[in-house]
Every structure is written in structure tokens, then in C-alpha cells.
Amino acid sequence: NIDKKVNFSEWYNTIIYASELADIRYNIKGFLVHRPWSAIAFRHIYRLFENELELDGHQPVIFPTLIPEENFLKEKEHVAGFSPEVFWVTEKGNEKLERKLALRPTSETAFYQMYSLWVDSFKDLPMKLYQSCSVFRAEKETNPFLRGCEFLWIETHDLFETADGAIAQTTTDLEIMKKVATNHLSIAFLPFERPQWDKFAGAEKTFAYDCIMPDGKAFQFGSTHYLGQHFTKAFDVGFMDSQGARKNPYSTCFGPGIWRVLGAIISIHGDQKGLVLPFVIAPIQVVIIPIVKGDAKEAVLNKADEIKSILATSGLRVHIDNTDKTPGFKYNWWEMRGVPFRIEMGGREVAENSATLARRDTREKAKVPISDLEKTITALANAMQNSLLEKSQNELNASIKTALTMDDAKRILDELCFAKIFICTLEMDGKRCADALKDFTKGGKVRGRRLDEKPVSGKCIVCGKDGMQAYLARQY
């Protein structure tokens, strides 16, 4: 019963452990043990993204976890950006390795080394590959599903004959993120083009997907990068075009942060009772609670088994809780774990050939004939998805306020909101004003320009020069 709006950090950390999503007591700081409840949810989140990627022509691959140091050194911006975060392997058994090997922080320098061997002709393009994996970064401050030394994601690495083809892919990546995060997982978010000083190391442009957390901070749970020819030139990836000229392809990468997506789901949809999991990723979608009294025990348990069989046959993930805990304890337990629907089955329901169906997000209950259970749950699952999205969108919209001055910007961030501001430019010349804003607002970072809004002109709230609309927020 902690109010996440009042004390988000306490609420979040309490629910992570109480609902058995994860355990931080593994004896390496910053590394997390994922318990079955999160591991199963991750499996479903992965499938949603992988299905969309494969519909878009991507194919899966599995690359080694280790990347040799010489690969990093081939792209100067990339190595400068990631070196402070890299874990290095320097020994094998009792022997010192002749060269250092990195635990992958991201895999551009692995993929492009192989692309130089695989790509020869324009007929090989586009090449669109992805892998689902863990990556490793030496983070100083960690928090489960928000920031970690090891985390789960998907990374795509795509090659195109032309710049236009690569840039078009970044738009497709955004559409994939919308389909999964918004349509399936009910997460409202803002798509941004990041400022030039905040782009991915080695990219020409970075596009990122931010939601707002209950404490008013921006949370990036995915990004797409237009890499131009930076990596293809560095790794000598080339192809013969239709005229026989040798060229370097243009490339992109897309990183749906699977780990962070779950962090967003926990934070945005959860309430004072605990998790509220979207139907499509819930490890258990329907839990049946037999309410056993006296002579009705056998009939109640038989009816619970019958209902489970009916629903499981239709593809639903169903569990019967026949432990010796009280019904009240079971209700609270499964509500805390975010199971979308609860069926209460007692002697009265057996006599009426019905079930009492409770919905997790609204906590509404209704008596439903057993013959109608499957279609009722399907309809309510769609309603739940829409309701969660509407709530998420309303909260996001209410958290965006316009700042005409630096004082406005600080006040808005202190109100746990995003500030809509004007800044002179998002090119490198604007970094001085962005740094001034960060200092003045105690941590507010320029997120960039929204991709789904038309450009708006105005005077920079720092220097007064003609500028453009952007967003400011504190962040994770």
C-alpha cells in the first residue's frame, strides 16, 4: 500500500522483490538474478518484438559475447564513447591473453567485422539481422530493470545501398516500437531525435523513445541510430553497385531495451496493490481460486479443473491456486503479481454453473456463465489493454507543460513533469545552452525534438537567439 506517486523508489523496489521478479542478492554488485515471473514475461516481450522484426525482413543470428579490442579501435567515436563502460577479459585460466577481449556493450564492432566478409554485391543488400541477447556495461549506479551492469535487449544491424533506404528504416523502427510498446503493452511514449551532443557514439543521428515515470523522470526504453557510413568504412564493408563501382553501404541499428520495457511496464501500470501486467505478457493470464467449504470441496475442485481445461485449450495461460492459504491471502498475492484475471469458484458458482470473474486493473467483478468465460475474458483483455493505454496516455499528456523562461523550466521539472522549451539549436552549438539549463534546473537534460510534432520556432530561453522547440526532463 505504498503510493508510487509519493515515494516511487520505495514502491518500485518493494514490488520488485515482493512479487518475485528479481533478486539482487547475487554476490556481484550490479548483476541481477531474474526469477521465473520476470523470465517468462521477458520471453513474451521478446516474441512480440521478434515477430515484428521478422515481418520486416530481419533474420536472427547469435554472435559471440566477446569482442576483441582491435574491433573497438577501428571506430574512434565508438571506442571513445564506450571505453569507460566496458568489462575486459584479460586472462584465460592461468595465462594472460595476448589481446584484451570485451564483454559486448553493444555489437556494432562484432557485426561489421563479419559484414566485411559477407557483403560483396548490391544483390546482398539490404542485409537486416538481429540478435536477442545480454549486453554488459560497467554502470556505477544500478536498479533492477532500469539500469544494470548486464541487461537484456534486441539489437538490429542493417545495411542498405542508399542513405534514403537506411533513413527509411529508422522510421520503420519507430513503427515497430509503436506496435509493440503502444498497441500491445499500453505504454504511451514520446519519440525524439536526440541533440547532436547526446547521440550514440559513432552515429549521425539518434532517435529515442522516452516515457515518463511516476517520479517525473524521463526513461528511455529503446533507440534507433542512423550510422551513415561510419562503421562500413571503418570495417571496409563494401559492395559492387549495378554499374560495377565499389561503394560502402549505409547502416542503422535499432535497440528495443527488453529489460527496460519491463521496467516501464512495472512503473507505469502498477498501483498500490502491486503489478498490473498487460494480458499479452503475463506469465499467468487467469488464476482460479477455489473457495472450498464443507461438502462442496470435491465439486468445486472438479469445476476448477474443468474451467482450466476449457481456457487452456483456447491458448490461455491458466493456474489453479489450490494451496491451503485463505482466499483473501490468495487474492492479494495474485493481485500483487499482476495477474490480469481472477476466477473465484465456490459452491454457489458450482450450483449456478457460473464463475465470478475479477479484473486486475479496475478490480471490477462480475458473474459469468461458464459457457461465456472464454469470450468474456478475450473481450475484457482487449478492454484492459485499451484502458491501460488511455491511462498511460492521459498521464503523459498531463505531464507536459510549456516553459517560457528558465525559472518556468525548473518549476515544471520540480512538479515532476516534462518542460516544453525553446533552445537555439540541437546542433553542437546548442550544447552550451543545454549545459546551462542542466545546471540551473538541477539535472534537466534536453531530450531533443519530437518526431511526431511539426517544428515550432521561438526564442531560446537561455541565450535569447532564434531557436526551435525541444523538451527538457530529468532522467534515469
Residue ranges and their predicted role:
Residues N1-Y476:
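NTP/phosphate- and nucleic-acid-binding module
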